[in-house]
């Protein structure tokens, strides 16, 4: 749901995803992973969330586990998305999914030692169930992407005027972020929850494309900023994120509607109002809906949407 701004990709021709045969859509668009190191790291950051010590845990293991959570306590006060060290840890752990140690991984020595000390305990008591949960979520998401992914990917690309760099790396974890998911860029790396009920069913499809769209979030920030400056209007700071929600949500709803499926945007449950004020969802539909229909330009829509906050 959240992301660090990335550089805007250059405008290019229509993407080739629509030509991918259906059975390969998920693999072509998203590369899914269930990484024990990233799962453990995020559980410790969340002070043991999703990992209540089992009754048969030895005193030694329980003590070591509690010490690890205590070590991570200062990190738990820092933002997973905007704290540079936490981002570096996430990036470093991304590629060691199958490693039995963190040899050669360049992260804080204390973090490395804590993760290596606790990994055998985590594997013994929690990882088999967590990995199974992650892979069940991945299987369900793959099915949806296989059915609807190519068309939705093409629509997202048209909306942003880009050629997406696919596949996007997606790590699935039992605990991902307080809001369920977050994305870092350069390269685009999504981390998404397998246990958050808000990311299940068709919402998983929307939120995968929402998260990957953060690669172009800077475009929305710059567009809102330029229009607001030109008109001397102050807009809600989360407005660019609300636009990103609307684009992914509306395009997902449009694609599913073509298959006879009624779908409500993730943010239509009150999130639009929380992001940018009462009635914001109506404003987004009034201005960005015509843009997605191909009837207005982005510049026109930014100007009109910002004006609605006067």
Where are these regions (language model features)?
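Bacterial N-terminal signal peptides that target proteins for export
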Residues: 1-9
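Bacterial Sec-dependent signal peptides at the C-terminal "C-region" and cleavage site
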Residues: 15-25
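Post-HExxH zinc-binding segment in Zn-dependent metallohydrolases
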Residues: 25-79, 90, 94, 220, ...
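Mature extracellular/secreted ectodomains of secretory-pathway proteins
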Residues: 57-136
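Auxiliary, metal-adjacent structural segments of Zn-dependent hydrolase domains
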Residues: 128-185, 240
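Short pre-active-site segment immediately N-terminal to the catalytic Zn-binding motif
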Residues: 192-208
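Active-site recognition of the HExxH zinc-binding catalytic motif
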Residues: 203-222
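Pan-zinc metallopeptidase signature
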Residues: 263-310
């Amino acid at each position: 749901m959240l992301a660090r701004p990335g550089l805007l990709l250059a405008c290019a021709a229509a993407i080739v995803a629509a030509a991918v045969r259906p059975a390969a859509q998920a693999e072509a668009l998203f590369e899914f992973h269930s990484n024990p190191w990233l799962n453990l790291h995020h559980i410790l950051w969340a002070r043991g969330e999703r990992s209540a010590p089992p009754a048969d845990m030895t005193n030694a293991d329980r003590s070591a586990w509690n010490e690890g959570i205590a070590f991570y306590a200062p990190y738990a006060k820092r933002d997973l998305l905007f704290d540079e060290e936490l981002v570096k840890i996430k990036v470093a752990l991304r590629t060691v999914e199958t490693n039995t140690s963190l040899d050669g991984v360049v992260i804080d020595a204390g973090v490395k030692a804590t993760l290596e000390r606790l990994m055998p305990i985590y594997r013994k008591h929690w990882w088999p169930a967590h990995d199974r949960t992650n892979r069940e979520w991945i299987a369900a998401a793959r099915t949806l992407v296989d059915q609807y992914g190519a068309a939705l990917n093409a629509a997202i690309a048209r909306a942003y005027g880009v050629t997406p760099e696919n596949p996007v790396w997606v790590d699935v974890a039992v605990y991902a972020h307080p809001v369920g998911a977050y994305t870092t860029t350069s390269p685009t790396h999504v981390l998404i929850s397998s246990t958050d009920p808000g990311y299940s069913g068709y919402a998983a499809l929307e939120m995968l494309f929402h998260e990957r769209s953060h690669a172009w979030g800077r475009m929305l920030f710059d567009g809102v900023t330029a229009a607001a400056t030109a008109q001397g209007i102050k807009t809600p700071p989360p407005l660019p994120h609300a636009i990103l929600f609307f684009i992914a949500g509306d395009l997902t709803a449009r694609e599913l509607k073509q298959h006879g499926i009624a779908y409500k945007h993730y943010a239509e449950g009150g999130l639009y109002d929380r992001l940018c004020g009462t009635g914001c969802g109506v404003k987004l539909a009034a201005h960005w809906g015509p843009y997605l229909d191909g009837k207005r330009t982005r510049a026109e829509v930014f100007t009109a949407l910002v004006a609605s906050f006067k």
